[in-house]
Amino acid sequence: MKIEVKLPTLGDDANDEATVSYWLVDEGEQVREGDDLVEMTTDKAAFSLPCPQTGTLSEKLVEEGEEVTVGDVLCIIEI
């Protein structure tokens, strides 16, 4: 089963954007629920996005330095 990891709502503005700063996990790597997957930055803050479920990071859909908006799929976790 594949789980899409999406950029969550970052505040009151549904059109929020963030930049992928640094991937903390490589494709093919095992991850546990709650592990940090990627570091993100906005114009107001920096934060890490946690893994929603235990599995394997099968595919990164965005590169470091790319800007994404709320709801965009960042990666796929195979469970």
Label each PLM-derived region with a short phrase.
Residues 1-39, 48, 54, 60-61:
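Acidic, low-complexity mobile loops and tails
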Residues 32-50, 69-79:
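Short hydrophobic beta/alpha edge segments that flank linear recognition/processing sites
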Residues 55, 60-74:
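PDZ-domain C-terminal substructure recognizer with occasional recognition of PDZ-binding tails
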